């Protein structure tokens, strides 16, 4: 009964595991990732800030009441004055205009930054997903190796009982089997750890069971890649390029806004207020409309305004230099990524040949070992070479896909 209960629980655990393809994992990450949610909030905040800056150019209305309470010994009544006022900026030297333009570009920059983080998130998910698959396939190789050694250990144990071989042959295979068991345990632990990393990226609970589906690699030919064309396109239209341009534009608007401090500020105020102070001891219903113009000009402030303006103009130059440096780095990264992709493709072809050779060698050596032509040392060496060739081939296939995704991410 206990065995059936354990089997039922095990089946439930499997049935409640979340199966994910790579595309599903990417979509889930975009939906749940906490860092991406924070960035989305930043975009909304910048939009609200843009609205606030635009509204600074609109008139504002305020109600104002002034109350004065005098000392009774002076025989003066307490008084108050009421008014409703409408204020409208007329001229601010371009401060309101450039702040509004700057806030718009800041919002667009934040949107581009959201896209950048989305691209980075997708690449992180792919890298983590690929690592899990590499470990999963590596585990299959080691489990096949363990089964091979278990089968061989049984044969050699029978041979030893028949006094056909000495005990050292059995011990070598047994030792190798223990080492394989240890490797399997390490790989399983690594898979668990890597899945924890992936679940964190996807915004899943760490106790959530996930099962990653194998990937069908689409055939893509690196010969179809036009490196020069891709690089030129990335320099002009990539998200990074757009962000760099916006940084310069923001600096220019900030500089023009600082320059407005040298110009006068003119505001129009239109009010409806009581003619004079009204007393609590008498009734006064006389109100009138009043209009006024406020003119303000900071003539001298020991050059602090000029220093701020010069600082802002230097910021423009700094951002232009930063753009040149960043785009040069981007070109170098695209070139390097392309070369990695070419190398990875050739590596796959080489590893395929190496795997075929290792497999054929192992089959020959296995036959020799069965016929006692070679000893367990040579057999285990051949088996180890086959295992390493299988793992290397697995990794090269997945690395090729990963390099291709890294190349594409640099162009976006």
Q: What annotation goes with each model-predicted range?
A:
Residues 4-13:
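Sec-dependent N-terminal signal peptides
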Residues 16-62, 166, 206-249, 299, ...:
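Bacterial Sec-pathway N-terminal export signals of envelope proteins
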Residues 79-81, 127, 172, 288-290:
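Transmembrane beta-barrel architecture of outer-membrane proteins
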Residues 83-85, 129, 290-294, 338:
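Membrane-embedded beta-strand positions in outer-membrane beta-barrel channels/transporters
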């Amino acid at each position: 009964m206990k065995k059936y209960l354990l089997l039922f629980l095990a089946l439930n655990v499997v049935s409640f595991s979340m199966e994910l393809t790579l595309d599903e994992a990417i979509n889930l990450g975009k939906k749940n990732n906490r860092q991406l949610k924070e960035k989305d909030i930043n975009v909304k905040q910048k939009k609200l800030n843009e609205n606030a800056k635009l509204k600074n150019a609109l008139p504002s209305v305020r109600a104002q009441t002034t109350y004065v309470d005098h000392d009774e010994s002076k025989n003066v009544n307490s008084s108050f004055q009421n008014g409703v006022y409408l204020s409208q900026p007329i001229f601010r030297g371009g401060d309101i205009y450039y702040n509004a333009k700057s806030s718009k570009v800041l919002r667009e920059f934040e949107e581009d930054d959201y896209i950048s983080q989305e691209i980075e998130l997708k690449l992180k998910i792919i890298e983590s997903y690929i690592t899990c698959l590499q470990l999963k396939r590596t585990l299959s190789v080691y489990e096949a190796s363990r089964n091979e050694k278990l089968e061989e250990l049984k044969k050699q144990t029978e041979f030893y009982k028949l006094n056909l071989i000495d005990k050292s042959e059995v011990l070598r295979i047994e030792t190798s089997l223990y080492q394989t068991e240890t490797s399997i345990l390490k790989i399983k632990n690594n898979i668990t750890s890597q899945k924890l990393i992936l679940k964190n990226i996807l915004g899943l609970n760490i106790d959530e069971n996930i099962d990653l589906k194998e990937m069908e690699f689409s055939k893509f030919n690196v010969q179809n890649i036009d490196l020069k064309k891709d690089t030129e396109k990335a320099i002009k239209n990539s998200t990074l390029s757009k962000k760099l341009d916006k940084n310069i534009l923001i600096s220019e608007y900030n500089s023009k806004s600082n320059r407005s401090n040298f110009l006068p500020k003119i505001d129009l105020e239109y009010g409806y207020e009581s003619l004079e102070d009204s007393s609590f001891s008498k009734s006064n219903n006389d109100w009138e409309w009043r209009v006024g113009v406020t003119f303000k000009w900071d003539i001298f402030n020991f050059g602090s305004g000029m220093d701020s303006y010069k600082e802002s103009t230097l910021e423009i130059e700094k951002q232009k230099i930063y753009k040149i440096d960043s785009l040069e780095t981007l070109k170098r990264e695209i070139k390097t990524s392309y070369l990695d992709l070419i190398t990875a493709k050739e590596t796959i072809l080489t590893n395929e040949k190496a795997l075929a050779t290792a497999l054929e060698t192992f089959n020959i050596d296995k036959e020799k070992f069965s016929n006692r032509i070679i000893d367990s040392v040579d057999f285990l060496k051949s088996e180890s070479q086959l295992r390493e060739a299988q793992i290397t081939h697995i990794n090269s296939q997945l690395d090729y896909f990963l390099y291709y995704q890294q190349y594409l991410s640099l162009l976006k």
